[in-house]
Amino acid sequence: MERVLGIGGYFMRAADPKALNAWYLDCLGMDADEHGLWRQEAGPTVFAAFESETDYFGSRSQQTLLNFRVRDLDAMLAQLRAKGADVSEDIQDVEGVGRFGWVTDPEGNRVEPRQPV
């Protein structure tokens, strides 16, 4: 059986794609080239479906949730706040999984930085 090798890209609609790309690169420290190619570090990726009525993604109109692995959640959230990002005060610790925080990008998408255990 043929299998996928990994996630090859994540694409989202935006009212101002150039500004949104710049926000992700600047605020999250992503080192991408002019075409958006970014080589992520090795690590696990979760693929999971949620109930259609979940409020975990924030707005009901948001159909997906982008989760980024980070080394230090507190440092990442402080970096985001320093850049004026809309960072939630909530942090969730899940035993055996890691620590989760949330930020809303300039287009209103909830994004989840996660510090794995």
Regions found by a protein language model. Give the residues of each.
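Terminal peptide-recognition signature
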Residues: 24
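Mid-chain, well-packed structural core segment of small domains
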Residues: 59-85
